[in-house]
């Protein structure tokens, strides 16, 4: 003879049932993430990342056996903190130059994207208008012919 489940076992079963129900239903309102456009310009690096490009080369020359990315990042961060503002100035200037180039590139990209987006629907609308106008012309001609023949018949009576 089977006995009743304990309260703890009943709760555990209820939790499992809730979890399985939740797993079966997809989330409402959530859509897949939009893919990245491969033509979009890459964001300009900050002054620190401009510094990192140079520092990586130096670090690899001094420590060829050390392949750890974390070690390179840690050493670069320590070195960057120890630099004075005047030492950081060339990196900041280069970063600003790259940022200006990026802003121009992204403006051109957005301009091209917006005009392409506007042109594509416009072409579709034009094609639809052409199709409708062709249909309407032939339908109008057909209707005129039919109306004329009906009127002729009415006149005869």
UniProtKB/Swiss-Prot annotation:
The keyword Phosphoprotein applies. Pfam families: HMG_box. GO terms for cellular component: nucleus. GO terms for molecular function: transcription cis-regulatory region binding. It is found in: Nucleus. Disulfide bonds: none annotated. It comes from the Eukaryota. The keyword DNA-binding applies. One of its GO terms (biological process) is regulation of DNA-templated transcription. Keywords: DNA-binding, Nucleus, Phosphoprotein. Residues 1-45, 59-87, 109-157 are annotated as: Disordered. The modification Phosphoserine is found at residue 149. Coiled coil: none annotated. Expressed in all tissues examined. Residues 41-110 bind DNA. InterPro entries: HMG_box_dom, HMG_box_dom_sf, HMGB_plant. Residues 124-133, 141-157 have a biased composition (Acidic residues). Residues 10-27, 76-87 have a biased composition (Basic and acidic residues). Signal peptide: none annotated. Recognizes an AAGG motif at the MNF1-binding site. This is DNA-binding protein MNB1B. It comes from Zea mays.
